[in-house]
Amino acid sequence: MNSIHRDIFKAIHEGKWLKIEYLNKEGRHTNYWIGIRDLDPWNKTLKVDGLHLNRCSIAGYDKIYIDSILSTEIVEGSYCPENERLIEDIALHPERYQNLFANTANLKILNYLEMCSKLDATPYTTDYELVRYIDGDQVRDGEYQLSEEQFKEIVTNFQRRMNRGTQQGKTLHIQKLALNILSIHTKNGLYVLAYRNLNLDVKNKAFKPDEDITICTQFTIGGEQENIRRYLDADEYELLSDFEKNLEKIKDAITEKNGARAVVDDMPYVIGLGMDCALNLHEEYKAILDMYEKEQVTFPIRAFFGDLLERPRRTKAYPIALLNQNINLDQLLAINNAMKYPLAYIQGPPGTGKTNTILNTIVTAFFNNMTVLFASYNNVPINNVFEKLSSLTYKGKRVAFPVLRLGNQEKVKECICYINQLRREVHGIKVFSSTLDRRKGDRIDRAKQLSGRLKEYEEVLDLTERKETLTQVMEYQERMKNVATLFHFHTDLQGRQLRNLDEKIQKIGEISERDAMALLDRNEDEFYSYLYYTSAKYIKELESNRFQDLRKILDDDEDVNEQAAAFNKYLQKSENVKKLQKVFPIMITTCISSHKLGEPEPLFDMTIMDEASQCNVAVSLVPIIRGEKLMLVGDPQQLKPVILLDELTNRKLRRKYHVADEYDYRENSIYKTYLACDAVSDEILLRNHYRCNKKIIDFNNKKYYNSKLQVQSDSRERQPLVYVNVDGGPGDMKNTSPAEVEEIMRYAGENPDKSIAVITPFVNQRILIERGIKENGFEHVVCGTVHAFQGDEKDVVLFSTALSDRTGKGTYDWLKNNKELINVATSRAKDKLILLADGKELERLHQGNEDDDLYELVQYVKMNGESKITEKHISSRALGIQPFSTETEAAFMKNLTHALENIWLTRNKYTIHKEVAISQVFHD
C-alpha cells in the first residue's frame, strides 16, 4: 500500500479532509483539499467535495481518479462527515478494496497507535493566531460560522502550518483550537481540565466542536507539569470517568479542597492548545506496510500482528560467552533462546538477575559476530547496562568494549568524547588476529552439547507443566456430577497418560546447573584477554580509510553543538549505520531516539528491549523495526507504561478502527501485546530470586508469581518483617500521616549505617517525608513513589500507607489492589520491610472485603509471614496455566467434558486437527 492509498484510508476513517496535488485532464498540476464522500474501488475513483486552494472555492466532484493523485497530506484539525456505510463495507469486505488497501487489519492498528501516540502528550496553552477569529460565546449552538474573509485567512493559516510541519520532519508540534468546558485558575496560570476540540468544517465554512469532551489529567503551565490529583482526591478522581454527568460535583470538589488557590472556570471561550510529540510515527509505520508490500516482513513484525503460526526450526548452536560465573539454568536458557530463535520473551521478577541476563546476551551476541540494538523507554536500565559494559577491565586496564550510548543532544556529545577516548586508549595496543581465539572449534563443540542440555531442560519444564495441567483436569473431573460417564477417560488420564509423562521426565533425568556450567568456558582470564584484544581491533578499524568522513566529524571539536548535529546527520543514513557497526556492533539508546539510527528498516541482527512491560506499544515498534530478531525482557506484575491519553479518546479511537483488546494503547505494554499475539514463541521465567530475605519475597511469590520463584538470597536478618501500628489521629490534610513521618525519622536516626528507602503511594505524604529527611540531614534515606524505585534496592524499605480518618473509600479502592505498587514497593527491601499503618483506619476501610492485597500484606507482616495468602489470577505462560479460574476456562472445560462424554458413550472414532479454518467448521 503506497502513502497515497494510506492517507485516503486514514481520511475516510478519521473524518478529515485531504490535501492533494492532482494531475487534471489538461495535464496541469492543481492543488485541492478534498472531503471524501464515497469510493469506487473497481474504477479507483473518489466522490468528493473539493476546495480549490488558489480560488478558495468549494465544489462537488463525482469522479476523482486516484491514479491521478500525485501526493497527499491529511489536513489535521479539519472535519468531514464520516461515510459509515463505506467504513463498514471496508471492514466487512476487505477483498473488494485489496487493490487499494492491502493489509487493512494491520493498517487500522498502525493508524490507531499513531493517533494514540500523537495525543499521549501533556498539553499547554499557546498563542495560536486563529483564536482571534472566534468568539466562544457564538459556539453554543454547535458550530461557529465564518465569513468569507475569515475562512480564507484560516485556510491560508492551515496551509502555512502544514508547510512548517513538513519541514519539521520527525518531531511534531501540534496546535489546535479548543472550546473551554472547565479550567482551573491556579497561581501559576490556567489549567485546562476539560475541553472540546474545534475542527474546521471546510464544506460549511464553520468551526465545529467535537461531540466528545477531552480530559487533561496532566497539563503544563509555564514549563511545570500540573496533575489533577493535586486538585482532586482519589475518591473524587473517579468522577472524571463520566465528566458531563458529574460536572457540578467536580467543580464543588475542586473548590472545597483548594479554596481561593484554585478558581474553577466553565465559561465557553476559545483557547489555543499546543502538544509536543517527540516522534512522528507516520514514516516509521509506513516502513512496516512496505515490508508487507515487498513480502520481506521480519519475524518480530509478523509476531506483532499475529502472523507467526509456527516457530522457526533452528539447528545452529551458538557458543555462550559469559562475563562471570553468576549464572543459572533459566538465564542460560534465556540467552540460548535469544540467540537461536527470532523471538524470546523473558519474564524477570524482582531480583532475578535480569540485568545480568541482558549483559551476557549482549556479550554472547558480540562473541558470535552479531549486531545488537539495546533499547528501553527510559534511561535508567540502558545507563546501567552501558556503565557495566564500558567499565570492563583486564589486568587493571579498561576493555574498550565496542558499545555506543546514543540518545539526545547531550548524550551524542558524550558519545563523541567517549569514541575519541577509546581511540586514544587502543592506539598503543598491538593486536595479532591469529591469536584472538585459538579454541574456537572447542567452543563450538561445547556449544552444541550445552544447547542439547538446555533443550532437555526446556522439555522437562514443559513436561512438568503438562503434568500439573493433567492433575488439574482430573481434579476438575472429580468435582463434576455424573463423572461415571467419564470413568474410562479419567482412568486413562490417571494411569497411562500420567505414567507416560513421569517416564519421559525420568528418562531425561535431572538437569543440574553443575552439568550446564561444565559445558561453559570457565577460563575467565582467557576470555577477558579475548575481549580486550578483540575490542581494540574493532576500535582500531576507525583509523582505516573507509572512516575518513566520520573521523572528520570526530576530530572537528571547535563547536561541540555543530559536531553533535553532524554526527546525528551521519547516523540518519542506513549505509553509515551499517558501516559504523563494523566498529561498534552494539548500540544503546532509548526507544524514541532509535528513530535517529538510519531509515526504519532491519539494520541490526537483534533488538533487545529492557523494561518492556513499561514500554508503550506505539513507540516500542521503532527499535523493533530495526532488528531481525527480538528479545523482550520485562515483568507484567510490576509497573505499567505511564499513559496520558484519556480513556474517552482512547475508546473513540478503538471504535473508529475496530481495534482488539490486545492492542489497546492504554491497557497494554509492548510485552503484554506480544504475549497476546504470539502463540508460538516461548516465555521464559527467571525463577531464582537473589535480592530479598525469604520472608519478604514470599508474599510476592505466593501472591503474584504462582509460587514459582526459588529464593536464593543470603539475607540473615532475624526480623525481616516489622509492623508499626501508628495512631494517626485526626488529620489536617488528606492522604497524610504526620505520626508515620515521626516514626520514619526516628528509625532513620537510629540506623545511620543502613541504606533506607521510604515508599508511599501519596504525593502529600511524600512531601512531608522529604521535608523531614531534609531537616534532619539524612543522606542515607531516599523517599518517593514506586516509579522512583523500579529496578532499585535498599537494605531497608519503610512502606508508609498514610491511611487516616480522611481517607475515603475511593482512595482505598485504588490502593488496596494496586498490584504494581505493592509488588514493587515490597520487593525493593533486601533485609527488612517495615510497614506503617493505622490499624483502626485499615479495619474501617477494609470492611471485611476478601479481595484486598494491602490488608493481606499488613496481616502477613503482622504475623511474621505466617498468614494465608490468596493467589492473584495471572495470565502468563511463564508462570504456568492457572486452573480454570475464569469464566472462559470454565466454559472450555464444560464443553471439553461434554465432547468427551459423547465420544466415550458413542464409541465413535475421532481424530484431532490443529489450525482448522472456521469456514470448515461452520457451514452456511
Predicted feature descriptions by range:
Residues 646-684, 701, 773-775, 808-913:
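Helicase C-terminal subdomain and adjacent C-terminal extension
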Residues 82-222, 490-491, 497-500, 509, ...:
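A helicase ATPase "motif cassette" and its flanking acidic/Ser/Thr-rich regulatory loops
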